[in-house]
Amino acid sequence: MPKIKSNSGAAKRFKKTAHGFKHKQSFRSHILTKKSTKRKRQLRGMKQIHDADKQLIQRMLPNL
């Protein structure tokens, strides 16, 4: 049997936590001049993925 491989794109985007996975928010990389300071501040940091997506992420990352 071959080794089970993780999806390399998903491995770069999601980090495992005690209660699931966290990810970086989108809309924060470029074209930031027209976005308000409040919006950019709220997009900072990592967020938890929704419960509906948890099983899909676990299937893509079996070794985490």
Swiss-Prot record:
Gene3D superfamilies: 4.10.410.60. GO terms for cellular component: cytosolic large ribosomal subunit. Residues 1-54 are annotated as: Disordered. GO terms for biological process: translation. PROSITE patterns: RIBOSOMAL_L35. Keywords: Ribonucleoprotein, Ribosomal protein. One of its GO terms (molecular function) is structural constituent of ribosome. It comes from the Bacteria. Residues 12-44 have a biased composition (Basic residues). NCBIfam families: rpmI_bact (TIGR00001). HAMAP family: Ribosomal_bL35 (MF_00514). PANTHER family: 54S RIBOSOMAL PROTEIN BL35M (PTHR33343), LARGE RIBOSOMAL SUBUNIT PROTEIN BL35M (PTHR33343:SF1). Belongs to the bacterial ribosomal protein bL35 family. This is Large ribosomal subunit protein bL35. It comes from Chromohalobacter salexigens (strain ATCC BAA-138 / DSM 3043 / CIP 106854 / NCIMB 13768 / 1H11). The gene is rpmI.
